C-alpha cells in the first residue's frame, strides 16, 4: 500500500489545468491519445504560432486526419507571416507538385518523394511519363513496393499485371487507387489461379481487401471470381466473408465449408469463433451446432442467441452491481484523462496478481466503479461480464427503452468511463465528437460548455441521450439508431435506401444484412450495442426475445 500511496502522490503532483494549453506542459505529459488530443487543441488555437504548432505536431503519436487537417490549416493561415517555416513532411510533401519536385530532385529525400507519389496515384493517368519516371527511380531502393505499384500502372494491361504481383503489392495499389479506377480494372478478366495464389498468401492487407470487395455495392465481377476460387490458407475473417459471398449466391454447401474453415483457424478470438459456428448453424440448421455454440465461454450476440434459444445456462457470468463500494470520493479525479491514462497503464503493466489487486483496492468506490470493472475485465480469466448502470439520477428516464439504449451505447462507446478519448478525439462517456458539442449544447439550452465538459458524466450523459432521442425520431429500431450514432444518420440513410439490406425475409435475415454493413467499425458496433441493449433490458426487468426483436428490422418504416 505504501507503493500505492506514493504512486498517487506522483500522479496528483502532475495535475494540469486543461483549460490553458501550454506546450511546455504538454511536452511533459505521457505520449498517447490523450496528449494527441490536447496537442490538437493547441495546434487549433488561433494564438498558436506556426512554429510552435509544428513542434506540437511532431510530439503527436498518431497523426490522424484531424491533426493533419489542423496543421494544414495552420500553415495556410500563417503562410505570409511565416514563409520560412516549412510544414511537416507528411503534409508538405503531399502539397508539392511533382513538376516542382522534379526541378530540384536532389533537394528532396526519398521519403518525401514517396509521399508525393502516393498522393498522386489517383491521378496517375494525368501525369506525363517524363515527370513521373525520374521520380519513380529515386525511390526504387527505399520503397520497392511503391516502385512496383507504379510499374504496374505503366503496363499495357494493368489488371493482368496486378494479378501477377504478390499480395503486398496488390493490396497497396488497391488502396491507393480511386474507386472509379478500381471499377475499371476489376471489370477485366480475373485469373482464378492467380487469385487463389493471392488468397493463400494470407497477407493481412489483402485479407482486409477481400472483406471490402465482398461488402462493396459494385465490384460484382471480382465477387464472382471469388465465388469461383477456393481459398485454403487464409485467416478466419477471410474464410468467413467468403462464406457470406457464397450465401449471397445461394451456394449454402460451399458457404458451410468456409464457415467450418473459419472456425478451424481462429485464434484467441471468441467472437470470430462463435460467429463461424453460428453461421454453420444457419447454413445447416443442425441442433448440435447450436448446442455447441450455447456452450461458448464468451458473451456475444451469437452465444446469447444460442443459450436463449435452447434455454440453457451459459458458462459466462453477468454482474450488474459491485457490492460494498465506498460512497466517498476516490483518491484521484476519474474525470481527468491524463490521470486515468497514467493509472490504467501502470495497473495493467503489473504482472503480479497481488500488486494488481492492491492497485484495484483504490477503486472500490461507487464513483470509480466503471474504472474498477474496466480493469477487472482486462484480466477476465473467469469470463465475467460487467453491466453496471452508474450515474443514475442525472436523467429522469422516460421509459426502460430510453434507459437501456443510453447505457447500451455508453458501455460500447467508453465502458462507462468518463475520461475516455478515442483516436478520432471523440470525448467522454458518450464519445461525443468535438464538432457536435456546440450544437448539442445550444439545443439543450446549456451555456458556457467547453470540450472538457464532456469528461463530466453529468453533462456527457445528457448530451448522448439527447442525440439518441433525436435519432429515434427518424430510425425506429435500436439497431438503426446504433448504426446512426456510430456512422452518422446521413450515411445510414443513404445505405438503407441504396442497398437491398433489411428488405428481404428468409432464414438468413436479418443476420445477413447485419454482416453486410460496409463499415467494419459500425458492423461490430451494431452487434455489440444490440447485445448490451438486450442485457440491460433484462437487468431492468424487461426480457426481449432476440428473434422477434431483430426481425422487427425487416418491418421497419426507416426504409422506403
Language model: regions and residue ranges:
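Generic helix N-cap/helix-start motif at coil->alpha-helix transitions
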Residues: 19-20, 29-37, 45-52, 59-112, ...
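Residue at a conserved register position within TPR or TPR-like alpha-solenoid repeats
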Residues: 213-214, 246, 284
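Amphipathic alpha-helical segments of tetratricopeptide repeats
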Residues: 260-265, 295-298
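Export/targeting segments at the very N-terminus of extracytoplasmic proteins
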Residues: 356-416, 465
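Substrate-binding/active-site groove segments that recognize
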Residues: 405-406, 423-447, 459-468, 490-491, ...
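Catalytic and substrate-binding regions of cell-wall glycan-acting enzymes that process beta-1,4-linked
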Residues: 483-542
Amino acid at each position: 500500500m505504501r507503493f500505492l500511496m506514493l504512486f498517487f502522490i506522483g500522479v496528483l503532483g502532475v495535475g494540469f489545468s486543461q483549460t490553458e494549453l501550454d506546450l511546455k506542459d504538454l511536452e511533459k505529459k505521457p505520449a498517447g491519445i490523450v496528449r494527441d488530443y490536447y496537442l490538437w487543441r493547441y495546434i487549433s488555437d488561433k494564438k498558436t504560432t506556426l512554429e510552435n504548432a509544428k513542434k506540437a505536431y511532431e510530439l503527436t503519436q498518431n497523426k490522424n486526419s484531424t491533426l493533419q487537417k489542423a496543421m494544414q490549416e495552420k500553415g495556410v493561415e500563417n503562410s505570409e507571416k511565416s514563409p520560412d517555416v516549412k510544414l511537416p513532411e507528411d503534409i508538405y510533401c503531399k502539397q508539392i507538385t511533382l513538376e516542382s519536385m522534379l526541378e530540384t530532385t536532389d533537394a528532396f529525400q526519398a521519403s518525401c518523394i514517396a509521399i508525393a507519389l502516393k498522393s498522386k496515384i489517383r491521378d496517375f493517368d494525368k501525369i506525363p511519363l517524363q515527370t513521373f519516371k525520374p521520380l519513380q527511380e529515386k525511390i526504387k531502393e527505399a520503397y520497392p513496393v511503391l516502385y512496383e505499384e507504379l510499374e504496374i500502372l505503366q503496363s499495357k494491361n494493368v489488371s493482368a499485371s496486378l494479378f501477377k504481383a504478390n499480395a503486398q503489392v496488390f493490396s497497396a495499389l488497391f488502396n491507393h487507387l480511386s474507386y472509379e479506377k478500381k471499377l475499371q480494372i476489376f471489370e477485366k478478366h480475373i485469373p482464378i489461379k492467380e487469385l487463389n495464389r493471392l488468397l493463400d498468401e494470407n497477407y493481412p492487407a489483402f485479407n482486409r481487401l477481400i472483406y471490402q470487395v465482398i461488402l462493396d455495392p459494385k465490384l460484382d465481377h471480382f465477387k464472382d471470381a471469388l465465388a469461383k476460387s477456393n481459398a485454403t490458407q487464409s485467416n478466419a475473417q477471410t474464410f468467413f466473408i467468403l462464406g457470406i459471398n457464397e450465401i449471397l449466391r445461394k451456394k449454402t454447401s460451399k458457404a458451410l465449408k468456409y464457415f467450418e474453415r473459419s472456425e478451424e483457424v481462429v485464434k484467441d478470438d471468441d467472437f470470430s469463433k462463435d460467429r463461424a459456428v453460428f453461421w454453420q448453424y444457419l447454413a445447416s440448421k443442425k441442433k448440435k451446432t447450436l448446442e455447441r455454440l450455447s456452450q461458448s465461454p464468451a458473451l456475444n450476440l451469437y452465444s446469447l442467441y444460442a443459450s436463449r434459444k435452447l434455454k440453457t445456462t451459459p458458462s459466462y457470468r453477468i454482474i450488474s452491481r459491485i457490492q460494498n463500494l465506498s460512497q466517498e470520493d476516490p483518491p484521484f479525479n476519474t474525470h481527468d484523462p491524463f490521470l486515468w491514462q497514467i493509472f490504467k497503464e501502470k495497473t495493467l503493466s503489473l504482472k503480479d496478481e497481488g500488486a494488481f489487486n492492491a492497485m484495484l483496492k483504490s477503486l472500490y468506490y461507487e464513483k470509480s466503479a466503471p474504472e474498477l470493472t474496466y480493469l477487472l475485465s482486462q484480466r477476465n480469466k473467469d469470463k465475467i461480464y460487467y453491466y453496471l448502470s452508474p450515474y443514475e439520477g442525472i436523467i429522469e428516464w422516460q421509459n426502460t427503452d430510453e434507459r437501456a439504449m443510453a447505457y447500451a451505447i455508453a458501455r460500447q462507446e467508453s465502458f462507462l468511463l468518463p475520461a475516455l478519448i478515442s483516436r478520432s478525439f471523440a470525448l467522454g462517456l458518450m464519445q461525443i465528437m468535438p464538432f457536435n458539442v456546440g450544437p448539442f449544447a445550444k439545443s439543450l439550452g446549456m451555456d458556457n460548455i467547453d470540450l472538457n465538459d464532456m469528461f463530466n458524466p453529468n453533462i456527457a450523459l445528457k448530451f448522448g441521450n439527447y442525440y439518441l432521442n433525436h435519432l429515434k425520431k427518424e430510425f425506429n429500431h435500436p439497431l438503426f439508431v446504433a448504426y446512426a450514432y456510430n456512422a452518422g444518420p446521413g450515411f445510414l440513410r443513404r445505405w438503407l435506401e441504396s442497398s437491398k439490406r433489411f428488405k428481404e425475409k428468409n432464414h438468413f435475415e436479418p443476420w445477413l444484412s447485419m454482416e453486410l454493413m460496409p463499415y467494419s467499425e459500425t458492423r461490430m458496433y451494431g452487434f455489440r450495442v444490440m447485445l448490451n441493449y438486450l442485457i440491460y433490458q433484462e437487468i431492468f426487468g424487461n426480457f426481449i426475445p432476440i428473434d422477434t426483436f431483430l426481425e422487427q428490422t425487416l418491418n421497419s418504416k426507416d426504409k422506403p
